[in-house]
Regions:
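Active-site entrance/lid segments in N-terminal catalytic domains of soluble metabolic enzymes
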Residues: 1-216
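Conserved active-site-proximal phosphate/metal-binding subdomains
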Residues: 81-99, 202-222, 228-377
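Residue-level detector of alpha-helix initiation sites
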Residues: 152, 227-228
């Protein structure tokens, strides 16, 4: 296969895999696609270790990094505010609500050493100042693409990337967003539709992709949101995209580090079992429906806080849930456990190796294109 994305990134298949698992990154890149490591939840030290491992594992194959540097967040109009000061802005009522959930669902507390670790890390970096050390680490490794997952990439991210020969990508949920990204110097656009897991906009992939393609041509566009098969890949390219950006589909692979309880939920879920909720990040993000999302939408909920206050508020609770949910006897934690995932979860009913997912997508893509071509005879 050959598209603009294949030429731009030096890959065989225009399949980009967004994942938080370094093993999936390596497997996809080695299979001819392009692995992108989601680094927002990592410390700079952890990112350094993972990128060094990936570089050695892929043997010269290309790979990239995805960060979350939102343009707007609590304290952004003040030039950024430290975690300690931000935590002081969390209302007592919200803290009481989260504590009440832990009691209601009998989620045991963390051991003291785990609790100290949570207090140090607080939450994933979701501000510019917190993301800079991650950028420093990323550019010290042989990445060829850096992506900002939420809003326009900061000017210095673009400048530093281009100075290092690294391409820059950005997600867009509207054509107007994509136009602004291109004007800022972005090299490729990820048109992410409403169906996607994580932070999404309001427009479905089928409508969004051609709108963005028309708005930013000749800049290459990746289609994202509800894509995990060769047929969906063929449809994306027919809409004008130059490749696909897939995230959810890797969460049930054998390499994935997805929480085992959550992975089992994914394997039995339908496409109706997700919703967009602010309950994890403070911004609308599609995730698996669970007792956690239901409680935040319930009549006793105080409502969610803006980013990054919501992640700071729930950091310890999420650690407690994840730790407890590994034991099926902790039924309350199992009910609460969830994670970001797109509507394609309804098709994620089998665990297989990540490289097999890539090759199956390519085979099905060929079959789909052949079928359409035969209609023209």
């Amino acid at each position: 296969m050959r598209t603009k994305i294949c030429d731009l990134l030096g890959i065989e298949f225009p399949i980009l895999a967004f994942t938080h698992c370094r093993d999936v990154v390596a497997a996809v890149s080695k299979a001819g696609g392009y692995g992108v490591l989601g680094a927002a939840a990592l410390t700079p030290e952890e990112l350094d270790i993972d990128l060094a491992w990936i570089a050695e594992e892929v043997g010269g194959k290309p790979f990239g990094v995805d960060l979350i540097v939102p343009a707007k967040y609590e304290g952004s109009d003040e030039g950024g505010v430290g975690s300690k000061a931000l935590k002081e802005r969390i209302p007592a009522g919200h803290r009481a609500f989260v504590d009440g959930l832990m009691d209601k669902y009998d989620v045991p507390p963390l051991p003291e050493d785990r609790e100290r670790k949570v207090n140090v890390s607080d939450a994933a970096p979701m501000s510019y100042d917190q993301a800079v050390p991650l950028m420093d680490v990323a550019f010290a490794h042989p990445i060829s693409l850096i992506v900002n997952a939420l809003g326009p990439p900061p000017p210095d991210m673009i400048e530093r990337a281009h100075a290092n020969g690294v391409k820059v990508g950005a997600l867009a949920g509207k054509a107007s967003h994509a136009v602004r990204h291109v004007a800022a110097g972005v090299d490729l656009i990820i048109a992410q539709g409403y169906e996607a897991g994580g932070h999404t906009g309001e427009i479905a992939t089928m409508v969004l992709v051609p709108e963005i393609v028309d708005a930013v041509t000749p800049v290459p566009v990746l289609a994202a949101g509800g894509i995990g098969s060769g047929r969906q890949m063929a449809a994306s390219l027919a809409l004008g995209a130059d490749g696909v950006w897939c995230g959810s589909i890797w969460l049930t692979t054998l390499e994935a580090e997805t929480h085992p309880t959550v992975k089992e939920k994914f394997l039995t879920a339908t496409s109706s079992d997700t919703l967009r909720s602010r309950s994890r990040t403070g911004k609308p993000a599609r995730q698996l429906r669970s007792a956690w999302t239901e409680e935040w939408e319930g009549p006793d909920s105080p409502g969610t806080l803006p980013m990054p206050l919501q992640p700071l508020l729930i950091a310890e609770a999420q650690h407690r849930i994840d730790r407890a949910a590994t034991n099926p006897q902790n039924e309350g934690a199992v009910k609460l456990a969830n994670y970001f995932v797109g509507q394609i979860v309804g098709s994620m009913n089998e665990s297989k190796h990540a490289d097999r997912v890539v090759l199956d997508m390519v085979d099905e893509f060929i079959d789909a294109v052949t079928r359409v071509n035969n209609m023209m005879e």
